[in-house]
């Protein structure tokens, strides 16, 4: 608790320890005692070091949005959600990792982040840029040039940096292809070929899929522009086996490297090996909702995501593997299709996340119907 007096400013949480401190230990409840009458700001900190000062780079913060008046506001029932702020943008560095590959690292929020080469390069020069998932990094692949350095402009919204990258590496990354699935191919799965280098050409005549009766299966190829992966889409049948063969030259990367022969054996299960969950979403917020069916020990595996625009809707999650599931709702206040964190100085709270109160334990060949999830503000 910070007492609000004539010397109080919002930035006090960065510079000065609170007037009163307590902790939650292993519960979500907390108590302050022997408080003086007056106005207060209440914050919650999850710190990397116990200095009772807010360090936005490493700490999480939460705050009560209203001024607390003592002794009037002696009981606070509104939960305080702690969150990690998005840091201001800062370009870190550019570094050559292999011949023909540079990584551009940055911190914080990016908007239209991109790089532009300003060095003179051959007319047949090619480059591909892709963001690395869950890392503040842009990967930049390019056809090698006879030069000891390259110059770039690095753009982010209104920011501009000039960068020179020294080129010393002698070896290009060999093309490595891996499958996203080995063994069981579930009906919700998409079969991907993942590559360490950007794929620039796919020759589907050098790819074959046959079932257990040696009948050729038709498929479609779909390149995922934002990732180094190619989807092979085909109609999966129950209790079936598939042999997928990729012959030499089916995939070509930016360096004109081609693959060797690859074979993948896949099998499907019976429909009865899966289950279904239905969930009636009752939206009483009149806001847009993001509804996630999730799983995993840390509830971090999104199985399916649905978007609901201000109305109620009945959702059916079918062909699910037998295991535990959870359903969560994100109140998408700014309608941008994703969860947004908060900001202490701007006094914006993170978008609300609400979990369906019951863990959904699904068995094979079983329908979990009749679930009602009412979303209130």
Region locations from a protein language model:
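N-terminal targeting or signal-anchor segments and their processing/structural boundaries
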Residues: 1-377
